[in-house]
Amino acid sequence: MDAIKKKMQAMKLEKDDAMDRADTLEQQNKEANIRAEKAEEEVHNLQKRMQQLENDLDQVQESLLKANTQLEEKDKALSNAEGEVAALNRRIQLLEEDLERSEERLNTATTKLAEASQAADESERMRKVLENRSLSDEERMDALENQLKEARFLAEEADRKYDEVARKLAMVEADLERAEERAETGESKIVELEEELRVVGNNLKSLEVSEEKANQREEAYKEQIKTLTNKLKAAEARAEFAERSVQKLQKEVDRLEDELVNEKEKYKSTTDELDQAFSELSGY
């Protein structure tokens, strides 16, 4: 009996120990599953990263291929450009040599042209000298006499225009004086009419003592005032017209003075030409 109890206790202890080991193994299994999940996640992430790296590698290789292709094209273009530069340098050298030869020929031709031009100028000068010497003194005198006649005609024409301008200026000045006199007369008449009007006004005031006579004479004085007023307006109109006439005459005087100055300048120029012609005649 005791042996059975001991065996049962021993079995219970083994059971408890087995339960503990089972719990421990279950916990270890859970932890192993967690580590396995983490490992799978890391593997998945690594696979994604490897795929990205492979894609990046493909792009880099493609870019490298394009870069190599462009580099080869640029190398070819550079080689072609270097060949063209060498050809252009050879052509420039040939052109420079041709230019030097052309400049030498041009200098030679320029020298010959200058000598020929000098000889031609000398021949032309000698021809003109001979032609000038071949002119007779009589022909030269005829030409000078014609110039003298023309100068005298111009001088006479200038004198005539000067006299005409002076006459017009005198007439304008006379008209201006008469206009000024008429204007002064008009102003005096206006003063007289104003004084007469003032006297009439005073008379009207003094004649107001008699109402009946004043009424009878009022109409007469009104008519007289109206007449005087009309005369005053007419005098003012004549004065304004005279003033406008004076302004117009002043403008005409200014214009004639300008014309007189121009004619004097023309007369002086003609006189100078005439004096020069006389001097040339005196020299012969």
Swiss-Prot record:
> GO biological process: any one?
regulation of muscle contraction
Q: Which domain of life is it from?
A: Eukaryota
Provide the residue span(s) of the region labelled Disordered: 1-21
Task: State how it assembles.
Answer: Homodimer.
User: What PANTHER family is this protein classified in?
Assistant: TROPOMYOSIN
Biased-composition ranges, Basic and acidic residues, are 12-21
Q: Relay the domain remarks.
A: The molecule is in a coiled coil structure that is formed by 2 polypeptide chains. The sequence exhibits a prominent seven-residues periodicity.
From what organism does this protein derive?
Portunus pelagicus
Instruction: Name the tissues where it is expressed.
Output: Expressed in muscle (at protein level). Expressed in pincer muscles.
What is this protein called in UniProt?
Tropomyosin Por p 1.0101
Where is the PTM N-acetylmethionine found along the chain? Answer: 1
